[in-house]
């Protein structure tokens, strides 16, 4: 996130903002603040609860400033009241502004977000086609952006041997690097669960027992499944 933030009332957010598919539950994010967001938790990315500073950071910041007190006794006396003063300050802000959110300086417009989603979707579908060409089974592309903050799409597919996983991964890496200039992070050698992370698209390649055991489709059950344009996908072998 960019370091500079600006406060704005949630009700004054851009009208007509791109709305993602509604979900019944979201994976919670851990925040460092002693205060929690208000009851409405459906603030779309990149908006998050504004109270991100921990009390420890507030105390450290204030104690390092010489504008407030001079000398050890004055500083100690000041710090003893910081906790109470900080809580009162936050209470006053909530009473005055209600639901407050922050925007980073690099927030994209709704149109730009839609364009990025479309580009990522095209990339994901092309990678899924690679898996299909190498005879992977039960290929699914899930739009997980509303559920996680670190990627837009999952590709989940079943392979039936480690050499097949290696072949799928190699062809995906080649396509991504040559056509899109992207290099994957993640597993280099094929595993029973092999992960390739291209940033906006994350691929999960499973052997059948691990696909059944981890059942990512159920774990991310609120994600929208993308209809793939190619047909005749291989089915998992018994």
Swiss-Prot record:
It comes from Arabidopsis thaliana (Mouse-ear cress). It comes from the Eukaryota. The lineage of its organism: Eukaryota, Viridiplantae, Streptophyta, Embryophyta, Tracheophyta. Keywords: Chloroplast, Plastid, Transit peptide. Residues 1-66 form a transit peptide. Interacts with chloroplast ribosomal protein uL14c (rpl14). This is Protein Iojap, chloroplastic. Belongs to the Iojap/RsfS family. NCBIfam families: rsfS_iojap_ybeB. InterPro entries: Iojap/RsfS/C7orf30, NT_sf. May be a ribosome silencing factor (Potential). Involved in plastid biogenesis. HAMAP family: Iojap_RsfS. It is found in: Plastid, Chloroplast. Transmembrane segments: none annotated. Coiled coil: none annotated. Pfam families: RsfS. One of its GO terms (cellular component) is chloroplast nucleoid.
């Amino acid at each position: 996130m960019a370091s500079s933030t600006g406060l704005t009332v949630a009700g004054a957010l851009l009208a007509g903002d791109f709305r993602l598919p509604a979900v019944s539950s979201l994976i919670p994010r851990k925040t460092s603040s002693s205060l929690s967001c208000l009851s409405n938790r459906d603030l779309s990315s990149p908006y998050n609860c504004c109270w991100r500073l921990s009390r420890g950071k507030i105390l450290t910041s204030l104690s390092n400033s010489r504008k407030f007190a001079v000398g050890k006794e004055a500083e100690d006396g000041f710090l003893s009241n910081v906790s109470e003063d900080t809580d009162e300050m936050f209470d006053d802000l909530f009473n005055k502004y209600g639901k407050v959110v922050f925007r980073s300086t690099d927030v994209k417009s709704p149109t730009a977000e839609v364009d990025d989603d479309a580009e990522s979707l095209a990339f994901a579908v092309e990678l899924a086609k690679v898996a299909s060409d190498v005879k992977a089974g039960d290929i699914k592309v899930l739009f997980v952006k509303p559920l996680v903050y670190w990627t837009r799409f999952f590709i989940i597919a079943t392979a039936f041997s480690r050499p097949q996983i290696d072949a799928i991964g190699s062809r995906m890496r080649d396509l991504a690097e040559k056509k899109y200039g992207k290099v994957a992070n993640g597993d280099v050698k094929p595993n029973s669960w092999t992960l390739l992370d291209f940033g906006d698209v994350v691929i999960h390649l499973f052997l059948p027992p691990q696909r059944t055991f981890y059942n990512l489709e159920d774990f991310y059950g609120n994600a929208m499944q993308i209809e793939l344009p190619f047909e005749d996908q291989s089915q998992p072998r018994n």
